[in-house]
Regions:
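Rossmann-like adenosine-cofactor binding region
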Residues: 24-28, 140-142, 146-240
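An N-terminal-biased, well-structured beta-alpha scaffold segment characteristic
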Residues: 1-60, 166, 186
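Phosphate-binding beta-alpha-beta segment of Rossmann-like dinucleotide-binding domains, i.e.
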Residues: 63-117
């Protein structure tokens, strides 16, 4: 339920600056003086931008501030999935290595990325930045985007969405949330993916049907997921993804290094 305080506090404003506070059709109608809405983020789905456009109100965002931090974080999630660094560090500090009969041990299968295929859905600035890192790791990169461009072709081969699902060892989401792609990661599309695929989501939680993903993680159709976003934030205690062990969830921090936060204000 939308708080009435939103419209109350911006009722006389001409310029509205927001981040996570929603600006809905109802709020826009209650605030006739608004001339500009600025979203201090890359994603702007907190604003009913279609209705704002109907009313002649520009909606602007900050599309470049988090390119480096979000792409870096996405790869960090992937490397944690591949090597379980946090777990092994914890067991060493708990004494397992000191007590081990062999000179080393690993508690999970470890994964080498070279030669594997990363499929990136949403190949704008962040997707392309992640693609460059993936290529530096020796991965093959394919991408799906509604608007392919030449800078992307230097990094990846553009493919259809079904081709990406079928051929990717790792799938990474970096697309805007729209009515058309809401819950695009669902039971039907997961069935098109390779067995043992890894899923990364640093875009919007609503891109994923969380119950379907939890089922796929439990069956190991999806080997692991690294998520910095979920459908409702903060996460609800009954989110089904909390019950599956092969799912890393972080509290929407990929954007948050000091350097990127400074760029928002610049």
């Amino acid at each position: 339920v939308e708080s009435p305080l939103i419209a109350e506090r911006i009722s006389n404003a001409e310029i509205v600056i927001t981040n996570k506070t929603p600006i809905s059709r109802t709020t826009i109608d209650k605030c006739p003086n608004i001339r500009l809405i600025a979203v201090l983020a890359t994603g702007y789905n907190v604003v009913d931008y279609n209705y704002a456009a109907e009313k002649g109100i520009p909606v602007v965002n900050v599309p470049t501030y988090g390119t480096a931090s979000v792409s870096q974080f996405s790869i960090a999630l992937l490397l944690e999935i591949c090597h379980h660094i946090g777990h092994h560090d914890k067991t060493v500090h708990e004494g397992k290595w000191a007590e081990n009969a062999d000179w080393c041990y690993w508690d999970y299968p470890l994964i080498e990325l070279e030669g594997k295929t990363m499929g990136i859905i949403g190949f704008g600035r962040i997707g392309q930045a992640e693609g460059r890192i993936a290529k530096a790791l020796g991965m093959n990169v394919i991408a799906y985007d509604l608007y392919p461009n030449e800078s992307g072709r230097v990094i990846a081969d553009y493919v259809t969405l079904d081709e990406l699902f079928a051929n990717s060892d790792v799938i990474s989401l970096h697309c805007n949330l729209t009515p058309e792609n809401t819950e695009m990661i669902n039971r039907n599309n997961i069935a098109k993916m390779k067995d043992g695929v890894i899923l990364l989501n640093n875009a919007r939680g609503q891109l994923v049907n969380e119950a379907d993903l939890a089922d796929a993680l439990a069956s190991r159709k999806v080997a692991a997921a690294g998520l910095d976003v979920v459908s409702t934030e903060p996460i609800k205690a009954d989110n089904p993804l909390l019950s599956v062990p092969n799912c890393i969830i972080t509290p929407h921090i990929s954007w948050a290094p000091k350097e990127s936060r400074s760029r928002i204000m610049d």
